[in-house]
Amino acid sequence: ITDSLGWVLFNIKRYQEAKDYLQSAGKLMPSDPIVNDHYGDALWKNGNQIQARYYWDYVLKLDKTEDDLKKIIKEKLIKGL
């Protein structure tokens, strides 16, 4: 639920609040690829590009990351958001 709320806030451009919720979600689910991807997105939109790339790279290393998400993450690592 925390991730979902954070993602809603992200999509309505409330990036700082989104980052806070997504950070909390990451603490609850540290190996969830979607949560870490969303947190990376929020970091990027808050001007923390280096940290965002760290989390996106981490998503690529998780065993349960699906191929479609890996492709999206690789694009983000090249182009950003």
What are these regions (language model features)?
Residues 4, 38, 72-76:
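Canonical tetratricopeptide repeat
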